[in-house]
A protein has these predicted regions:
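Structured, active/binding-site neighborhoods that engage oxygen-rich ligands
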Residues: 1-171
């Protein structure tokens, strides 16, 4: 509660939507089964279970309420579709499907496209999910980066940026 303009959670941890989203996605896998989890089912959970409405979250939810289905929900009139909200919630997919690169990148896409459409935010989620899934079995950072890069378009800003950093590091 708020008292004297200060938040007092009485010793309770503060909510963290990045963790909360991953717990809801785990709930989706457990209740629907991995094969039934897709952008549409995740979109329904966004609307029913996820309170924040800021930035890409709000745009995606409002677009779904208007009748736009993912990935259009994350793409239409979304100034934040290139932001980082999706890749920071990919750990759950890597933990559910370790080493299963094709499955984990599909799940990252299904998740990210709801609020990031076809933007760079979706490419970032796919890139990160792929390297996280492989990291269970391979700790070579260059291998991980190359595997992640192999799953996104070379022309994407994410790919170009990662390759630029890798080149700078090499030099």
């Amino acid at each position: 509660y708020i008292k004297d303009n200060k938040i007092d959670m009485l010793g309770e941890p503060l909510p963290n939507e990045d963790l909360d989203l991953q717990l809801i996605w785990l709930h989706a896998v457990e209740t629907l089964g991995a094969k039934a989890v897709n952008a549409a089912s995740l979109g329904e959970m966004w609307i029913g279970l996820i309170p924040p409405n800021w930035n890409e979250y709000g745009i995606g939810k409002n677009n779904m309420r208007r009748g736009l289905i993912p990935p259009l929900s994350g793409d239409y009139e979304n100034l934040w579709k290139h932001s980082n909200g999706a890749w920071i919630r990919t750990e759950i997919w890597a933990c559910c499907f370790p080493g299963m690169i094709n499955k984990v990148t599909q799940m990252a896409f299904e998740d990210a496209c709801v609020d990031h459409g076809f933007g760079e935010g979706t490419y970032a989620a796919i890139f990160v999910a792929a390297l996280e899934a492989v990291a269970f079995f391979n700790n070579n950072i260059n291998d991980l980066l190359e595997i992640g890069l192999s799953k996104i378009p070379e022309s994407s800003r994410v790919s170009r940026s990662v390759r630029l950093v890798m080149d700078c590091y090499e030099k």
